[in-house]
Amino acid sequence: MTRTPDDPRLELLQGTLDMLILRTLRWGPQHGHGIGQAIRRQSDELLRVETGSLYPALHRLVKRGWLKSEWGVSEANQRAKFYRLTPSGRAQLIREQDRWSQLVRAIGRIMNPAPTAEE
């Protein structure tokens, strides 16, 4: 999808998709399309996860043991694979949130430095 200069949507920072998926699944099991919709809704439509990024990430998280998947029926009465957090996925989410907080603080110190005598 081509973006225009006035498009308010934001690009996901590299490495944040896994964290967003894990956080979204803290609210409960969800199918892939629902995870993408939840990220979009919770970000006030600023973040959109493309299918080509979402499903490889889900498979990677299952392979790492952070998610479990099982087939079920969606709200549209369609067969869908539902994902849920595992205990190790919850632990990973805590680690990811801690790293994210550190990153935000570090960037904040650069973007909003304390005034110095030189300024």
Regions found by a protein language model. Name each.
Residues 39, 43, 71-73, 87-89:
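Short, well-ordered turn and helix-capping elements at secondary-structure junctions
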Residues 40, 59, 63:
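Residue-level detection of the helix-turn-helix DNA-binding "recognition helix"
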Residues 88-119:
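Amphipathic alpha-helical dimerization/coiled-coil segments
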Residues 10, 51, 79-82, 97, ...:
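Short, structured helix-loop boundary elements
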Residues 62-78, 84:
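Beta-hairpin "wing" of winged helix-turn-helix
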Residues 9-55:
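N-terminal helix-turn-helix DNA-binding core of bacterial DNA-binding proteins
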Residues 1-10:
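Short, Lys/Arg-enriched N-terminal segment that forms or immediately precedes the first helix
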